Amino acid sequence: MENNNGNNQLPPKGNEQLKSFWSKEMEGNLDFKNHDLPITRIKKIMKYDPDVTMIASEAPILLSKACEMFIMDLTMRSWLHAQESKRVTLQKSNVDAAVAQTVIFDFLLDDDIEVKRESVAAAADPVAMPPIDDGELPPGMVIGTPVCCSLGIHQPQPQMQAWPGAWTSVSGEEEEARGKKGGDDGN
């Protein structure tokens, strides 16, 4: 469970706590009778997949244990960040910091945030387009139309169609009635 980012390492105390937690978990026996997470709920979630026809009796128990271990590990890493900030309450920022600093939790990062960060960085440092002398574009580029595989095969843009009734006009009488009933007048 080493952090490969290098810039924000956990304190040695935290690494020791995590190591002792994982060594105890690896040595411990799987208790088939006591569960912290509801097994029937896990079975329901597993059955949402249309490809699942039968579930072995051990599968929900193992998945429950894996989820418990995942939650405990993330909580411990978040708790270490809360202690670094001299707080005794976990906050979302602690969980975010634990996720950001741990490579194995990269799947929890929000792709939309990453895309926004990339677009902001691109806008801050625009790359100039090289001048085109002959009026020709580089291979694979056609203005306004995507090109498939740089072969010059143009893909038509899908046409947007409005749903019937999606854009309805309001008659003058209805507008007046809305105004008399206390409408917001577009504010």
From Swiss-Prot:
It is found in: Nucleus. Pfam families: CBFD_NFYB_HMF. Expressed in flowers and siliques. Residues 177-187 have a biased composition (Basic and acidic residues). Keywords: Activator, DNA-binding, Nucleus, Transcription, Transcription regulation. Its main location: nucleus. Signal peptide: none annotated. GO terms for cellular component: nucleus. Residues 163-187 are annotated as: Disordered. One of its GO terms (molecular function) is DNA-binding transcription factor activity. Stimulates the transcription of various genes by recognizing and binding to a CCAAT motif in promoters. Heterotrimeric transcription factor composed of three components, NF-YA, NF-YB and NF-YC. NF-YB and NF-YC must interact and dimerize for NF-YA association and DNA binding. Belongs to the NFYC/HAP5 subunit family. This is Nuclear transcription factor Y subunit C-8. It comes from Arabidopsis thaliana. The lineage of its organism: Eukaryota, Viridiplantae, Streptophyta, Embryophyta, Tracheophyta. The gene is NFYC8.
